[in-house]
Amino acid sequence: MTSSLHRPFRVPWLLWAVLLVSTTAASQNQERLCAFKDPYQQDLGIGESRISHENGTILCSKGSTCYGLWEKSKGDINLVKQGCWSHIGDPQECHYEECVVTTTPPSIQNGTYRFCCCSTDLCNVNFTENFPPPDTTPLSPPHSFNRDETIIIALASVSVLAVLIVALCFGYRMLTGDRKQGLHSMNMMEAAAAEPSLDLDNLKLLELIGRGRYGAVYKGSLDERPVAVKVFSFANRQNFINEKNIYRVPLMEHDNIARFIVGDERLTADGRMEYLLVMEYYPNGSLCKYLSLHTSDWVSSCRLAHSVTRGLAYLHTELPRGDHYKPAISHRDLNSRNVLVKNDGACVISDFGLSMRLTGNRLVRPGEEDNAAISEVGTIRYMAPEVLEGAVNLRDCESALKQVDMYALGLIYWEVFMRCTDLFPGESVPDYQMAFQTEVGNHPTFEDMQVLVSREKQRPKFPEAWKENSLAVRSLKETIEDCWDQDAEARLTAQCAEERMAELMMIWERNKSVSPTVNPMSTAMQNERNLSHNRRVPKIGPYPDYSSSSYIEDSIHHTDSIVKNISSEHSMSSTPLTIGEKNRNSINYERQQAQARIPSPETSVTSLSTNTTTTNTTGLTPSTGMTTISEMPYPDETHLHATNVAQSIGPTPVCLQLTEEDLETNKLDPKEVDKNLKESSDENLMEHSLKQFSGPDPLSSTSSSLLYPLIKLAVEVTGQQDFTQAANGQACLIPDVPPAQIYPLPKQQNLPKRPTSLPLNTKNSTKEPRLKFGNKHKSNLKQVETGVAKMNTINAAEPHVVTVTMNGVAGRSHNVNSHAATTQYANGAVPAGQAANIVAHRSQEMLQNQFIGEDTRLNINSSPDEHEPLLRREQQAGHDEGVLDRLVDRRERPLEGGRTNSNNNNSNPCSEQDILTQGVTSTAADPGPSKPRRAQRPNSLDLSATNILDGSSIQIGESTQDGKSGSGEKIKRRVKTPYSLKRWRPSTWVISTEPLDCEVNNNGSDRAVHSKSSTAVYLAEGGTATTTVSKDIGMNCL
């Protein structure tokens, strides 16, 4: 019973207790009257006769006792149940006459229930509490066991976790070395780095070099070695620590970073603490001081700028190498005072008091908190716009601070090259000025720089001398502007700027013979090309030497035409070309030689050059003889001189139908010309660059191309040149050359680049034969500068030089005397009396050789020199017109006294049968009334045809033209309009030297008119020859 009292009270137990009482009542010898209350009205087998509901009692069976159950909560006692209690166990448990609670209340309902039993009648009406106070720490054995187990498990988990954390921290430090994310000093290797073992007691401060914001710099002596000592006060201790730590970063040694020796601290005589940084001594001092005392040439200036850039690029580079790691470093105070100059002319970067180590988006700078401001530091004059505005990109600190350094580097570039002597040719170099010194003076304020740099977006001004169109100067200006760009993201990186500075030095190396600045009308590409063939003959003759950069103003006046020439090459060789040398500027050379033999325009006579040029090639290339004939007033005033009669097997005259207009000129589209006029010098420079690298140089010694100008067919010769005697009444003779010595002309491919000459095409006879230029005879070629051709109207009449060339054989890798004889004449005479039967078979063989293949066709897709004009300088028209007037008079009147007609009208006319044997058909022009008129110079380089009779014969149209005569201009450059090589006429080349009218002859005349002076050039057994066309017959014989 005792154990049951100690157990927690539950309602089912009470029911079982009542059941037990009821079941054992029968065993009791005495009936007991007890108080009764049962709210649940459970039927426990008690008869209704025993329960008295009026007074709430029950008559218990014998052996039963009374019990009561109360609930005590919040000071109130509520009766739960009363009745008879029949128990099994010790009867002494309920031997009390009163209902006394002697046991501790059970834990049911937090100990609020009270139970008692007694053995007298109605003893259970009330109850009495009589039990000891409960224990303050009563713990049941199961609960104590669970608590101890929880404590043990928690302690073990914490211990294991602590061990893991310690192991991870140790492993992280071992793997990353001195790296740490954050702003605090954590570099284990750096902290463990040993200072150089130097005794600072031997350090002596000799003289003060300079003083800055954070200390003074002295020249000192350490162990009898000159050193520079930077002294910091106690107030600037943080700058000392930071600069010392930057110098001690692993892999910090570099040629363009100041060499650090040792850093230490000491007490002064008055007890103050000072900090010393001992560094290598640089006698030239800072870059600012050096530039104020010295000027430099282009190479030295590039060396200064390149070395600073190289040092900054190394600072900005993150460099892991083995066990060492160098983070990227931002200087943050880069200016010309913090750059030192070494004895070899290179620079080193110093003063790292404000520098930061950069690790991604975080910074490493000892002594600063995470929210430390990284803006508004450094020298105000060199602050970038974003720093002045307080708009540094804190999300990408690494890139932002590098861009700040690049802005300052651009200002240093400007300071360095403002003292470059090569950039100020012909004038004194300006005194040294710091950046923005002209705008804000020597002591600018923060607000001044904000207004100037951030709001007004101004930068230091480039001088007028830097406005020249030079590749070097232009690249320099672009580099500087890309460094100090207003947009920080658009600035160059230090590595890119280093490459650009190296390229500037390479440009100078390639252009040693010229200054980096050139004349305005010259392009950098012309400088490059002029260097490859700078051997020029001296200027000879009455006319100035026009270089490739010359251009011609558009003019319709006769003698008021203005020719501007600004040479991009200031130095010329004083040694003339001799035999055996290859002159690449052949057109210019020919013109100079011709001018040298002309005393004046008024007394021009025919002269023959005796100087020849030879070409050494590595392959078998055709060799052609070349000579120059200038204008001849008249045969009776002077005579033709010839030397070295050609050695030929059997000279044979050749008779061919003289034709003109096998070539057709593609006229320029005015829209295309306008487009060319609008092109800037930048596009011209790019065009020249692309042209240079798009194909091989046609003038190189290894090129197999033979290039022919359109007006003067000038080619180069190998070996000794011979000339035949040409006099009045003597025909032009062509020597017989053995077929074994004839080699086909090389094939000239149509390279995909800008053509350098006019194309070939045959005009349809149904089309209009000429292009109308209008009343003022203006050319459709407009003025174009630098790289675009210009053509003026040409009104003055003048006989043009005719070059007669013949191919010989050039041996491999050595010179061979050519067997080809070349005879040249201008409006010369050809005698009659040549045998027609010899002409027939000789001309037939020549025409067959022309149709062999493409390799035998001469290509005129390019000229011998892309720098030189297509036309020679025109002679003054005063005396020449008089000469041509006499020529016209002689053409119009019959022969007198057997004298040969100067225009070959009656010189050995060939029979029609001879002409048909060559496959060439001629149609005689109907005679018409002859009207004497004055010959005039053509308005443009026009080779269009008037009438086409068949595939091999073309009649030359002629019409009258009115206009004033005047001196013409020459074409200095090719027009950029693309030409196409449409079709070859393999039978003949016809290049007219007689001007054709600017208006179309549409007067309905049946007479086929001819040019008074034309030249037909044709191939004959691998050679070339020229002759003139007759006005009456339209053909002539050689």
UniProtKB/Swiss-Prot annotation:
**Modified-residue entries (Phosphothreonine), positions:** T379
Q: Which residues are recorded as modified (Phosphoserine)?
A: S586, S680, S681, S843
> Which residues take part in binding ATP?
209-217, 230, 280-282, 337-338, 351
Q: What keywords are annotated for this sequence in UniProt?
A: ATP-binding, Cell membrane, Disulfide bond, Glycoprotein, Kinase, Magnesium, Manganese, Membrane, Metal-binding, Nucleotide-binding, Phosphoprotein, Receptor, Serine/threonine-protein kinase, Signal, Transferase, Transmembrane, Transmembrane helix
**Can you tell which superkingdom this protein's organism belongs to?**
Eukaryota
| GO biological process terms, semicolon-separated | anterior/posterior pattern specification; aortic valve development; artery development; atrial septum morphogenesis; blood vessel remodeling; BMP signaling pathway; cellular response to starvation; chondrocyte development
Q: Which regions of this chain are Extracellular-facing, per the record's topological domains?
A: 27-150
Feature: compositional bias, Basic and acidic residues: 872-896
The segment(s) forming the Protein kinase domain are 203-504
Q: Locate the compositionally biased regions of type Polar residues.
A: 909-924, 937-964
Tell me which Pfam families the record gives. Answer: Activin_recp (PF01064), Pkinase (PF00069)
Q: Any idea where this protein resides?
A: Cell membrane
What is this enzyme's EC?
2.7.11.30
GO MF annotation terms = activin receptor activity, type II; ATP binding; BMP binding; BMP receptor activity; cadherin binding; growth factor binding; metal ion binding; protein serine/threonine kinase activity
Q: What is this protein called?
A: Bone morphogenetic protein receptor type-2
Instruction: State the organism of origin.
Output: Mus musculus
Q: Which gene encodes it?
A: Bmpr2
